[in-house]
A protein has these predicted regions:
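Aromatic-lined, polymer-binding surfaces characteristic
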Residues: 85-89, 97-98, 102-173
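Extended, charge-enriched "interface" segments that sit outside catalytic cores
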Residues: 2-99, 106-111
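Intrinsic structural disorder
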Residues: 1-7, 129, 137
């Protein structure tokens, strides 16, 4: 029954020649950020702590490994193996299974998933910490400068690019 209902909506939408405009007023149901005053104190404390940790280059890899990095990170470094793996090659000619000197691709990708900049952006918005926002932008600008499109390890996976897009939407919110 649910599948038929979904197909019915798809059929109706396919024939629609006029889509309603998005209602961005304060009374609309369109998603928007919550009121800052409603944020619990525990969240504020956690954001303050995380922003200080990230600004000092202490990142959490895979949700549980605390790793000291440069700030901004060296985007071409596997911090777990302590190995730099710079390359100027096209991402389409790289094989992430053939990294040199014991390096692995996942620790190399982890800082580029932008969990740190997301927390910095959240701290900027919720706590009014302008320095966290500037720090977030510094990291993003450094990433862009050091990872040209389709060049290097960070462009070998469409999934990783998608994760960066999701993180960017959080930062941009």
């Amino acid at each position: 029954a649910l599948r038929l209902r979904k197909k019915g909506y798809e059929f109706q939408d396919a024939r629609r020649d006029h889509w309603p405009a998005a209602d961005l007023s304060l009374t609309s149901a369109f998603p928007k950020l919550p009121d800052r005053a409603a944020a619990p104190e525990r969240l504020r404390d956690a954001l303050k702590r995380d922003a200080e940790r990230v600004a000092a280059g202490r990142l959490r890899f895979f949700g549980h490994l605390d790793v000291q990095t440069d700030t901004p990170p060296n985007w071409q470094r596997d911090y777990l193996a302590g190995v730099d793996v710079p390359t100027g090659k096209s991402a389409f000619k790289l094989n992430h299974r053939e990294l040199p000197d014991g390096a692995a691709i996942k620790p190399l990708w982890e800082p580029s998933r932008w969990a740190g900049p997301v927390r910095l952006a959240q701290a900027c918005w919720l706590l009014g910490n302008r320095r966290s926002g500037e720090h977030c932008l510094d990291w993003l600008e450094d990433w862009v400068a050091n990872n040209p499109p389709y060049t290097g390890w960070h462009w070998t996976s469409a999934l990783e690019s998608g994760m960066r897009l999701i993180a960017f939407t959080w930062i941009d919110a």
